[in-house]
Amino acid sequence: MTAPAADDRIDEIERAITKSRRYQTVAPATVRRLARAALVAARGDVPDAVKRTKRGLHEIYGAFLPPSPPNYAALLRHLDSAVDAGDDEAVRAALLRAMSVHISTRERLPHLDEFYRELFRHLPRPNTLRDLACGLNPLAAPWMGLPAETVYIASDIDARLVGFVDEALTRLNVPHRTNVADLLEDRLDEPADVTLLLKTLPCLETQQRGSGWEVIDIVNSPNIVVTFPTKSLGQRSKGMFQNYSQSFESQARERSCRIQRLEIGNELIYVIQK
């Protein structure tokens, strides 16, 4: 019997992933890229490649969310109640509750006011702000002090999460656009005054070595914010600050980029001017 073609086996892996409640709304481009690499590593063994693909999705996406998909409908109801009541404090409380669902944003919550106050001291007031691999970070818009006319452009690999972000920003009356996008597969040449890449580069490098700076080079934005975690998800430092700072600053020098470095909470921050 002739072995199935690689594309057929990748289709089979993709079908298996879409049956998983945890990963069924991840961008097909992401699933297929990981499936392709997994199939090679598994030497064509589809069941093994499915396991490897899920492992890859966990590393770049699943590890940051609860084991079951968040109840976005309930989170929106809480936000709706606060907005309808006209209670700004209740709105912020609902947003904090929602952001705590995602580990990456949850880690930032104790320092949220300081984070955006200090960050935007080093940035121009943007007409357009793009948030790549955004997670639930767009829900922090009320803390950013953006002009009312600023358009917030948010993208992520998870269609379910992106839909929630779109609904939340609509309720907050934030001008915005959202889309499902994979930074290693989709075009990144839409212009924006400021682009955020918060805790994103380590996930890119996990998938493709050298891809972090490739994305920075391609992004059509004069001001780019890149951040790194200085502790692991288990809250261990593992020399992360030194490793990330040395590597990133070396690459920045090679490109003659102007950078400013900040550290707030467990986050190493670079403001890049291209």
Swiss-Prot record:
Gene name as annotated: sgm
A Pfam family that the UniProt record links to this protein: FmrO
GO molecular function, one term: rRNA methyltransferase activity
Family according to the record: Belongs to the methyltransferase superfamily. Aminoglycoside resistance family.
Effect in UniProt of substituting residue 108 to A: Loss of S-adenosyl-L-methionine binding
Other facts noted in the record for this chain: Protects M.zionensis, which is an antibiotic-producing bacterium, against self-intoxication.
Enzyme class: transferase
Free-text function comment from the UniProt entry: Specifically methylates the N(7) position of guanine 1405 in 16S rRNA. Confers resistance to various aminoglycosides, including gentamicin, kanamycin and sisomicin.
Any one biological process term the GO annotation gives: response to antibiotic
Catalytic reaction annotation: guanosine(1405) in 16S rRNA + S-adenosyl-L-methionine = N(7)-methylguanosine(1405) in 16S rRNA + S-adenosyl-L-homocysteine
UniProt entry tagged with the keyword S-adenosyl-L-methionine: yes
Keyword Methyltransferase among UniProt keywords: yes
Chain positions recorded as S-adenosyl-L-methionine binding sites: 102-108, 133, 156, 182-183, 198, 207
EC number: 2.1.1.179
Name of this protein: 16S rRNA (guanine(1405)-N(7))-methyltransferase
